[in-house]
Each structure stands twice: as structure tokens, then as C-alpha cells.
């Protein structure tokens, strides 16, 4: 989560390296999430061949390489080699994305398995998400402090955050190396099983659900940050604190999701949170132009500063409560009753995370054409689909024998 969420504040830095559009500023997100399209199925094959532990270790090594390449891009001369710097950074983001895909493929089915599937499996996935949200909050606050004045920020300013990310990977590698993990028996991943998995209507619609869900989870904080810095002129340090609230809301939501996950069905969860997302985003878009004071920190003097922000921004931030349970609940519903297709289904599921890159491109294009606030219609459309999936698309019409 810490590494993945570096992409949004890095987009703020990139956007101020020259006359760059919102579409181009999102290259970190493109590289990070397109990697899922490339690695989704191969990651499932790695798990099948090497098991969870070795696959996780492979992913951590790959991630470390990606972080180092991004760090190298910050050492290059931006003024004379802007295109080359972007290319090197994009390669680093892509390689880091390969790592994220591998680790997600390991963690989600493992948690679901340990919980025994069903509501208990969903509960464990939500608990895992708590740790994700904690790291995301830390990432935004740290990057806001490092960026400071966004107009003057360079990729090299993010070096401390990149080194922390590298340290996380190294520590995780050491811990996992000395941890005994019970490996379930893995059936070989056969590509011809893809057609079989996709023949299940609820799974096929669920993969599209993950595709659009990524547009909500990443799109909301991403474009709130770009709006407050580019259009509203707030300092990056304050905006980092503001956007961190979104991820803090996700943290709270995941605590709640973990506590009720065994009692409330995934279908009910998605019905409630997708409806709430639609309402919150629409309010954020059409809220009165009232401003309220929000505290920030001047990291140079360590003084509290107050900035006026639009009331509707708080509505966008509350969407974090909704997205907090979406991933686990969608995954839980989509793989229900797949039997022998579950392994390949996990790989397909991870592949569809590349939807974030697509949705970021679409929303960035809309933002360039009609403005940041109007671009949130993309988020509304994504939430409407998830509501459809919860009410209709997720119904299991047939089950595979276990």
C-alpha cells in the first residue's frame, strides 16, 4: 500500500516539471497498474509452482528493483532529459507494479483460505486491509511533507519515501524468509481453465467489478489532490494531510468491516457502500461553495496552519469508508462456488486491477477537457455498476464441484 500510493503524490511532482496534462501526469499510475495486466496470470502460475512463501519472496525482490529504478530517475537531470527521466520513472513504476500484483495474488487467496471462505474469509481480508490503509495514510502525510511547495518539487525530493519503501521490502523479505508458512496443495494453473472460469456469469461480472472499483478507490483521492493543488492553490503539505483523511476513513471502514464481516454478507456490504458512494460523490460535486478551515502543518517551522477548503471535499473524503470493504467483498462474491477454477480465477482477478490505469486515463482526460469536479462523473458511473453487481450480477446461478 505504501509503494502503490506513492504514485498519486508523485503525479503532483511530475505535473510541475513542465506544461504537462493530467493524462501525462498519471504515468506512475499507468505503469504501476498496467503491470497487473501483464503479471496477473503469471503470478498465479508462480504460486502454483513455488507456493505462497517463495512467490512472496520473488515479488519482494522484484519490488526492490522497481524502487531503485524510480530512485535513479530522481538523480537524473530533469531540465535537459525530461523525456528520458519520465521513461526511467515509468519503467520503475511498472516493475514495482509487477511486485504489487504478485503480493496481492499471494495475500488475498491465503487470507480467504485461512478464513475458510464465505463471510469468515471476507473478515480476514478486511483485517489485512487495515494494514494497507495504515501504510497509505503514512504515505500521503510523508509525501506531503517532502513535496512542500509543489511548484518547486522534483522527483529527487521523494528519495526518503522511496528509501522507506525499499526498507519495507527488505524487512518483509527477512521476516518471511524465517517464517514457516503452511502451503496448501496447489493444482497446476492451466490456461485452458480461463474459459471455464469466465463461463460463470457472477465471476465474469465480478472481474468487471474490480476493474471499475479501482477507478473509485484511486480516482477519488488522486483527483481531489490534483484539484486542491492545481485549481485551489493549496500547498502540497496541507493537501497531503487532507487526502490522508480519505485513507484514514478506509482504515476505520476496514476495522468496521472486519468486525461485522462474519455477520453481514458481502452482497449487503456492496449494496450499501456503492449506494453511499453515489450519494457522497454527487454531494461533493454539487455542494454549496462554502469553505471550512482545515489544519495543516508547515514542516519547515513545525507550525499549525489553517487553510480554507470547499465543503464538498469532505464528502469525497468520506468515500474512503465505502471503498474500504469493496475489494474483499467483490473478491468474496466473485469466487463463490468456482471450485477447481478458483486458482486461475485469482490470477484473472489480479489482471483486472489494470482497470485503475484505464479509469485514471479516462478521468484525467475528462479533467483536462471539462475540469476536475466534472471528472467525478466517472466515479459515479463506476459506483452505479457496483450497485448493479451487488443486486443482480453477483447471484450464483451454478456451482462447480469442489
What does each of the following model-derived ranges do?
Residues 61-82, 276-305:
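C-terminal ends and interior cores of transmembrane alpha-helices
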Residues 86, 90-130:
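Cytoplasmic helix-loop-helix junction between adjacent transmembrane helices
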Residues 1-22, 104-108, 220-228:
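Extracytoplasmic
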Residues 27-46, 244-256, 355-358:
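Central cavity-lining transmembrane alpha-helices of secondary-active solute carriers
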Residues 108, 121-180:
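Helix-loop-helix hairpin linking two adjacent transmembrane segments in secondary transporters
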Residues 7-8, 199-244:
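Extracytoplasmic gate region of multi-pass secondary transporters
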Residues 38-86:
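Conserved MFS/SLC helix-loop-helix module at the cytosolic interface between two early adjacent transmembrane helices
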Amino acid at each position: 500500500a505504501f509503494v502503490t500510493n506513492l504514485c498519486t503524490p508523485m503525479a503532483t511532482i511530475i505535473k510541475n516539471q513542465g506544461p504537462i496534462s493530467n493524462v501525462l501526469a498519471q504515468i506512475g499510475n499507468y505503469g504501476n497498474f498496467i503491470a497487473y495486466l501483464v503479471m496477473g496470470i503469471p503470478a498465479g502460475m508462480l504460486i502454483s509452482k513455488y507456493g505462497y512463501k517463495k512467490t512472496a519472496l520473488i515479488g519482494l525482490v522484484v519490488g526492490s528493483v522497481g524502487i531503485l529504478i524510480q530512485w535513479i530517475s530522481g538523480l537524473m537531470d530533469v531540465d535537459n532529459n525530461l523525456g528520458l527521466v519520465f521513461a526511467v520513472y515509468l519503467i520503475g513504476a511498472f516493475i514495482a507494479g509487477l511486485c504489487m500484483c504478485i503480493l496481492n495474488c499471494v495475500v488475498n487467496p491465503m487470507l480467504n483460505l485461512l478464513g475458510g471462505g464465505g463471510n469468515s474469509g471476507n473478515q480476514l481480508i478486511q483485517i489485512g486491509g487495515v494494514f494497507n490503509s495504515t501504510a497509505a495514510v503514512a504515505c500521503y502525510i510523508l509525501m506531503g511533507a517532502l513535496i512542500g511547495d509543489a511548484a518547486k518539487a522534483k522527483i529527487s525530493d521523494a528519495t526518503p519515501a522511496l528509501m522507506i519503501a525499499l526498507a519495507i521490502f527488505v524487512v518483509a523479505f527477512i521476516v518471511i524468509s524465517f517464517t514457516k508458512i503452511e502451503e496448501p496443495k496447489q493444482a497446476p494453473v492451466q490456461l485452458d481453465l480461463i474459459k471455464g472460469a469466465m463461463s460463470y456469469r457472477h465471476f465474469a461480472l465480478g472481474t468487471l467489478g474490480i476493474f471499475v472499483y479501482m477507478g473509485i478507490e484511486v480516482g477519488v483521492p488522486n483527483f481531489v489532490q490534483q484539484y486542491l493543488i492545481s485549481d485551489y492553490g493549496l500547498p502540497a503539505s496541507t493537501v497531503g494531510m487532507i487526502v490522508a483523511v480519505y485513507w484514514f476513513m478506509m482504515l476505520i471502514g476496514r476495522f468496521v468491516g472486519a468486525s461485522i464481516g462474519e455477520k453481514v454478507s458481502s452482497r449487503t456490504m456492496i449494496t450499501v457502500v456503492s449506494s453511499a458512494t453515489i450519494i457522497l460523490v454527487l454531494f461533493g460535486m454539487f455542494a454549496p461553495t462554502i469553505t471550512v478551515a482545515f489544519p495543516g502543518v508547515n514542516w519547515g517551522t513545525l507550525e499549525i496552519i489553517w487553510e480554507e477548503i470547499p465543503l464538498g471535499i469532505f464528502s469525497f473524503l468520506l468515500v474512503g469508508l465505502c471503498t474500504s470493504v469493496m475489494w474483499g467483498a467483490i473478491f468474496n462474491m466473485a469466487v463463490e462456488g468456482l471450485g477447481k477454477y478458483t486458482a486461475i480465477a485469482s490470477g484473472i482477478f489480479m489482471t483486472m486491477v489494470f482497470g485503475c490505469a484505464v479509469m485514471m486515463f479516462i478521468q484525467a482526460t475528462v479533467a483536462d477537457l471539462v475540469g476536475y469536479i466534472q471528472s467525478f462523473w466517472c466515479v459515479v458511473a463506476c459506483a452505479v455498476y457496483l450497485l448493479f453487481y451487488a443486486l443482480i450480477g453477483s447471484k450464483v446461478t451454478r456451482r462447480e464441484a469442489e
